[in-house]
């Protein structure tokens, strides 16, 4: 089962390292922080940076919750495990599949996507955002990011991912443009 631990923003990497050092591998299969790629320009050149996909959250994979919770009591800086007020709730299969689809099973890195804007519609031509155009709430072309609105952790969350718009056309003739790519 996949669980999500809430931590103070900025301490994610420290908490992940603590968990890996202190919790037995038989209890905690994996502890990770998903990242996304974003293009950023500095010193006159474009660079690809990696940023935390869900600031303030660390993901845990464990089969048995009770020994995991007992061990997490010794992790300094953990706020809580996501769930309802009474119980801890693992991520749903749909949430897990979305994370795997976007970031891969092992590396958990959402790679940069490329898209075209035709009129008032965006079409993703490559990358993990393909087929997810309906979830895009906002595009910041200057920062080269898309903000997605997704149901995660039992609520609707905004998720930033890297998106480079390689072309913008005012007309609505998308077929000709998409056939060229």
Enumerate the predicted regions with their spans.
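Short, conserved beta-turn/loop elements at beta-strand boundaries and strand-helix junctions
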Residues: 127-129, 139-144
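Short linear motifs in intrinsically disordered
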Residues: 111-114, 135-140
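Acidic-enriched and Gly/Ser
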Residues: 1-121, 147-181
């Amino acid at each position: 089962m996949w669980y999500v631990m809430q931590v103070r923003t900025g301490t994610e990497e420290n908490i992940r390292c603590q968990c890996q050092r202190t919790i037995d591998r038989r209890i905690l299969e994996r502890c990770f922080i998903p990242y996304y790629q974003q293009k950023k320009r500095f010193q006159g050149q474009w660079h690809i940076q990696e940023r935390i996909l869900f600031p303030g959250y660390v993901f845990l994979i464990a089969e048995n919750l009770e020994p995991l919770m007992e061990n997490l009591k010794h992790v300094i800086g953990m706020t809580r495990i996501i769930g309802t007020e009474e119980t801890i709730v693992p991520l749903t299969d749909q949430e897990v599949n979305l994370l795997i689809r976007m970031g891969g099973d092992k590396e958990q890195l959402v790679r940069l996507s490329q898209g075209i804007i035709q009129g008032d519609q965006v079409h993703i031509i490559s990358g993990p955002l393909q087929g997810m155009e309906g979830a895009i709430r906002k595009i910041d072309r200057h920062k080269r990011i898309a903000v997605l609105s997704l149901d995660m952790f039992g609520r609707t969350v905004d998720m930033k991912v890297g998106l480079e718009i390689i072309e913008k056309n005012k007309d609505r003739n998308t077929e000709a443009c998409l056939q060229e790519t």
